[in-house]
């Protein structure tokens, strides 16, 4: 909201400067976003009167003016402005004047004729971009008067950034109330005595929708002169408040809206074809608005109709059909209280906004409508003339303002400072909040213009604002420092984040709400948790997997020429669970486990001239996952399985101690192609609880004996997983004390014979490497051979394996 300081000071004029005024408003919650001068700095410009004008002897487009600048002698000024004429009052930059931009005025000869100064346009003074001619000033201004004083150009324009709850401050009067409360300066509110009623013409109005309109008032005014000029003082205030002057009737309506916060509408009475009705629109109805936009209406939008013809979009904008023009003679002046809920969001549906809707959807004073009708009428009669009829005022459904109780002790506790009872009473009085004292409580009845006061904390906020946040002492919080034991067997989210980051992954944070298609495609979830009020229409469901969001970020980076992307996210997912009840951290019916997901795409390692380039694959990311589990990695199992987001032949279910904890695999080719990725990213998703638990390190004796390495190659069924054989080896070691010296076993080679035409390969060779070491003695060949034989026998018995020659 923008307004000139002079307008504000016409209602309340505290003895403080502009900067202090801006500071106090900001500290009271009315943020002054910007202050700027009404005009740029310039000097030496005065009011002047063109006494005579003659053609230039050597230039057709120039004229020689004799100008009275109040000094007692006429100045000769050469001017080329098309509107220069005798009798005109204009700005004159005297010799020695300095204009915006640093231009200095001196005596000059123009085509042989001396010019002692310059007559100025609005653009040359920095007042507007208008340079079509000289700036015409009111004839009543005295020549020689400094132009800055004559036009109040030292005024300051305030721009406020208001919060949505402070609708009462969307007017000069509202801001003036605040200034009066903050400074204790008396407030002079705009007022008008009821105008004499000289005609008895009325326009019947029926309110058919009390849930739309709670109060409707209006009056007929006949014989107005719509061509009357808007007074300069009003035009200046409107322009400095960011409003364009249109015509006297429109300007008066806008002026009162800005001054007292009362949107109103002026109908051309002769264009209204019947009695007025206020109702909800009907399907199929249309309206051409004042901005030229034609809109299709529906029952969710309020309208004012004449007979069956829609004339106005209630609380938003009038219609073109009944708009006033310069030929208008008779008008109907309307002001109403529209329920905020009935106006909110309606203008945005039609992709525009209006000053009226901006105010009505936040709440406009419903008690002062008759007084404001009189104020507007007085201005119309004074400027445009006419005869006023009686005011018809219908009240059908006004808000009931329930008293709000504020406990003084509660106020002290919330603010952290003991504001005296007398000062609290004074604050409420200065704010215009009627109250009663009941013991240590204040019972306040919110005024009709304060829609933001509903609960006790609202009143405490009012006390804090006027008391002054700067007066509240800074008190550091005091708490008993208590050491909490951190269990070694469990790690927190930050520790897990550091682990993943150490594996060359970068953390991202996505929205928890996603597209419904993502849930269906990536998680196979046809019944996700849906949002009642999504922030965007496509983000309509809660995610049950983190994978889709990571793939979307990979796509975003790939489109921007990134060739290697490694990301992770730690966040909650949402699953339906009818068995889950409400709790401190739970919502009934929705399970919210914490998950860790990662994605790797592009090169397996950073590009380096001495290292062959290859794409990251399943086993690279499998190694990353195993590294996250540390000593518990030997309890991990990767079981071939299918998941909607993953490649059917390159995906695995991750199990820990036999329990499923997540998934690992390449992205499904369909989703890879859909994301326009030239090769598939590898993704994983893990239950955080499985990662949080860790195995404590066990101290064991460090062997001084050399290790022995032996290899064993076996033929087995081609479909047998290598992990099954490693599990058999681990079971044999645990069961047989003689195998306690076997420290590790790994697969180091897989070999298959080339298939013969028409035949399938039924066997494969798996080569295992074993590390054997004793802590007491050096192992001899007999002991080593015996251990390898025992392992081979266990594998033969369990998997029908045979040793490869």
UniProtKB/Swiss-Prot annotation:
It comes from the Bacteria. It is found in: Cytoplasm. Residues 399-474 form the B5 domain. Its cofactor is Mg(2+). GO terms for cellular component: phenylalanine-tRNA ligase complex. Belongs to the phenylalanyl-tRNA synthetase beta subunit family. Type 1 subfamily. This is Phenylalanine--tRNA ligase beta subunit.
């Amino acid at each position: 909201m923008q307004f000139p300081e002079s307008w504000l000071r016409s209602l309340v004029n505290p003895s403080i400067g502009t900067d202090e005024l801006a500071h106090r408003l900001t500290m009271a919650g009315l943020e002054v976003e910007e202050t700027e001068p009404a005009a740029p700095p310039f000097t030496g410009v005065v009011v002047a009167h063109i006494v005579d004008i003659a053609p230039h002897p050597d230039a057709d487009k120039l004229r020689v003016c004799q100008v009275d600048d109040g000094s007692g002698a006429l100045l000769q000024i050469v001017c080329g402005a098309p509107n220069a004429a005798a009798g005109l009052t204009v700005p004159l930059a005297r010799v020695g004047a300095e204009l915006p931009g640093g231009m200095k005025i001196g005596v000059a000869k123009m085509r042989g004729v001396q010019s002692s100064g310059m007559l100025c346009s609005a653009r040359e003074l920095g007042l507007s971009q208008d340079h079509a001619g000289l700036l015409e000033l009111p004839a009543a201004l005295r020549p020689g008067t400094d132009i800055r004083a004559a036009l109040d150009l030292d005024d300051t324009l305030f721009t406020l950034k208001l919060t949505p709850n402070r609708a009462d401050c969307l007017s000069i009067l509202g801001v003036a109330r605040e200034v009066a409360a903050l400074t204790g300066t008396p407030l002079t509110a705009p007022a008008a005595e009821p105008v004499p009623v000289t005609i008895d013409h009325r326009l019947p109005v029926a309110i058919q929708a009390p849930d739309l309109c709670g109060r409707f008032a209006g009056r007929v005014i006949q014989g107005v002169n719509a061509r009357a000029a808007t007074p300069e003082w009003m035009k200046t205030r409107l322009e400095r408040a960011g409003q364009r002057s249109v015509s006297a009737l429109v300007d008066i309506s806008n002026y009162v809206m800005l001054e007292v916060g009362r949107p109103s509408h002026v109908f051309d009475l002769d264009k209204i074809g019947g009695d007025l009705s206020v109702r909800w629109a009907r399907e199929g109805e249309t309206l051409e608005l004042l901005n030229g936009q034609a809109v299709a209406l529906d029952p969710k939008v309020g309208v004012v109709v004449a007979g069956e013809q829609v004339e106005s979009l209630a609380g938003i904008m009038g219609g073109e059909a009944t708009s006033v023009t310069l030929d208008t003679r008779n008008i109907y002046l309307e002001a109403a209280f529209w329920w905020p809920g009935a106006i909110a969001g309606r203008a945005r549906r039609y992709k525009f906004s209006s000053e009226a809707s901006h105010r009505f959807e936040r709440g406009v004073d419903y008690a002062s409508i008759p007084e404001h009708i009189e104020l507007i009428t007085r201005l119309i009669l004074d400027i445009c003339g006419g005869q006023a009829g009686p005011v018809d005022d219908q009240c059908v459904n006004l808000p009931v303002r329930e008293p709000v109780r504020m406990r003084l002790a509660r106020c002290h506790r919330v603010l952290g400072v003991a504001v005296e009872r007398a000062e609290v009473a004074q604050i409420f009085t200065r704010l215009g909040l009627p109250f009663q004292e009941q013991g240590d409580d204040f019972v306040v009845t919110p005024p009709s213009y304060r829609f933001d006061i509903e609960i006790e904390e609202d009143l405490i906020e009012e006390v804090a604002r006027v008391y002054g946040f700067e007066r509240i002492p800074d008190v550091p919080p005091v708490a008993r420092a208590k050491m909490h034991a951190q269990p070694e067997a469990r790690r927190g989210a930050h520790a897990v984040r550091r682990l993943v980051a150490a594996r060359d992954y970068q953390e991202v944070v996505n929205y928890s709400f996603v597209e419904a298609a993502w849930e269906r495609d990536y998680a196979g979830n046809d019944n996700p948790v849906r949002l009642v009020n999504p922030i965007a229409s496509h983000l309509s469901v809660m995610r049950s997997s983190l994978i889709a969001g990571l793939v979307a970020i990979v796509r975003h980076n790939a489109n921007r020429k990134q060739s290697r992307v490694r990301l992770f996210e730690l966040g909650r997912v949402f699953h339906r669970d009818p068995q889950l009840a409400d709790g401190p951290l739970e919502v009934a019916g929705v399970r919210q486990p914490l998950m860790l997901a990662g994605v790797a795409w592009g090169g397996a390692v950073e590009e380096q001239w001495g290292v062959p380039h290859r794409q990251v694959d399943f086993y690279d990311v499998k190694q990353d996952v195993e590294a996250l589990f540390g000593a518990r990695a030997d309890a991990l199992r990767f079981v071939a399985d299918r998941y909607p987001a993953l490649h059917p032949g390159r995906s695995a279910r991750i199990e820990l101690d036999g329990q499923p904890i997540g998934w690992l695999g390449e992205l499904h080719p369909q989703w890879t192609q859909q994301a326009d990725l030239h090769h598939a990213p590898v993704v994983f998703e893990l239950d955080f609880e499985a990662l949080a638990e860790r195995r404590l390190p066990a101290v064991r004796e460090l062997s001084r004996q050399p290790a022995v390495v032996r290899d064993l190659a076996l033929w087995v069924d081609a479909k047998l997983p290598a992990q099954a054989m490693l599990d058999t080896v681990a079971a044999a070691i645990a069961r047989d004390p003689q195998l306690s010296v076997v420290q590790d076993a790994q697969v180091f080679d897989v070999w298959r014979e080339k298939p013969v035409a028409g035949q399938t390969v039924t066997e494969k060779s798996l080569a295992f490497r074993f590390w054997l070491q004793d802590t007491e003695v050096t192992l001899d060949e007999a002991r080593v051979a015996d251990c390898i034989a025992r392992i081979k026998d266990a594998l033969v018995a369990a998997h029908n394996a045979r040793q490869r020659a």
